């Protein structure tokens, strides 16, 4: 089971999340049949959305949009405060690796553009924040969002490691660290040093206790306490009934065309690839 550990330094000056999102990203890859570069980019965006969702409470939903001008096209992920996330990438068929190391390349295919974060708290108007993509690697872009839009100094690392022989997801996860208002400059410098000198995310994720390893490396000599473990999962909230309401909202004329030309309708959810079929009778019931 995927999970996130939330923690805070004992002096209350920093908080950090560590995530194992392996099954989440693996399911996304299987559902969308993504190629390696697309898998890593989508996976990082899903993890970023889970990080943001973990910051929220209640029924708030977070949408993360990576809107670059590269070959990848838009990457969209939607998460809630309960650890659920869904998402998709427009171009699923990108497979580019460094010849020397086999490292999957992401940023060149995301390109230049924007990271958009939308918070829907069930009020009339969702909150929306937007920053320029500074690297296209997604983790650094999310850290820039926290600093620019929420004035919170942060460090974010997200990654997806693929099996060399099959390009399936081997492991996926990441971390987020935030400095809270009482953090001193000296403490921030110490934490920055810890993060710069820590092993790669891939190395930590393949350790025996990946989430503890990440948190130990982040805090270094600073004492911290765990605030709890919480489950994470790929989960889409689509349903046949919800899409039926969407068809109904189209109005009489388009529905009559579906009945006359196709004798029914088929809808595929772009977030999870679930397929829903509607009979002629079900469509007629919408307009009678």
From Swiss-Prot:
Role played: Redox regulated molecular chaperone. Protects both thermally unfolding and oxidatively damaged proteins from irreversible aggregation. Plays an important role in the bacterial defense system toward oxidative stress.
Stated name of the protein: 33 kDa chaperonin
GO CC terms of this entry: cytoplasm
Keyword Cytoplasm: yes
An example Gene Ontology molecular-function term: unfolded protein binding
Keyword Zinc in annotation: yes
GO biological process terms on file: protein refolding
Pfam families in the cross-refs: HSP33
Gene3D superfamilies per UniProt: Hsp33 domain (3.55.30.10), HSP33 redox switch-like (3.90.1280.10)
Keywords: Chaperone, Cytoplasm, Disulfide bond, Redox-active center, Zinc
NCBIfam families cross-referenced by the UniProt entry: PRK00114.1 (NF001033)
Family matches, as CDD domains: Hsp33
């Amino acid at each position: 089971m995927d999970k996130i550990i939330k923690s805070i330094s004992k002096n209350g000056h920093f908080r950090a999340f560590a995530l194992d999102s392996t099954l989440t990203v693996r399911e996304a890859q299987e559902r969308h049949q993504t190629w390696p570069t697309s898998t890593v980019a989508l996976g990082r965006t899903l993890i970023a959305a889970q990080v943001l969702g973990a910051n929220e409470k209640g029924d708030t939903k977070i949408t993360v949009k990576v809107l670059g001008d590269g070959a990848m096209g838009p990457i969209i992920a939607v998460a809630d405060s309960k650890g659920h996330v869904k998402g998709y990438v427009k171009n699923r068929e990108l497979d580019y690796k460094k010849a020397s190391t086999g490292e999957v390349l992401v940023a060149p295919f995301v390109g230049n553009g924007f990271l958009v974060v939308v918070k829907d708290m069930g009020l009339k108007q969702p909150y929306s924040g937007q920053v320029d993509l500074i690297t296209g690697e997604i983790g650094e872009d999310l850290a820039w969002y926290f600093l620019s839009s929420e004035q919170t100094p942060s460090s974010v690392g997200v990654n997806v490691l693929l099996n060399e022989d099959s390009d399936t997801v081997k492991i996926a996860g990441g971390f987020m660290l935030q400095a809270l208002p009482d953090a001193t400059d000296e403490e921030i410098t110490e934490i920055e040093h810890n993060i710069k000198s820590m092993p790669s995310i891939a190395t930590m994720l393949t350790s025996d206790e990946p989430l503890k390893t990440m948190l130990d490396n982040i805090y270094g000599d600073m004492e911290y306490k765990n605030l709890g473990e919480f489950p994470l999962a790929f989960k889409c909230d689509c349903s046949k009934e919800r899409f039926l309401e969407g068809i109904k909202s189209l109005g009489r004329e388009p529905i009559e065309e579906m009945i006359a030309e196709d004798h029914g309708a088929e809808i595929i959810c772009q977030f999870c690839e679930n397929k829903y079929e509607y009979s002629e009778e079900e469509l007629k019931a919408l307009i009678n």
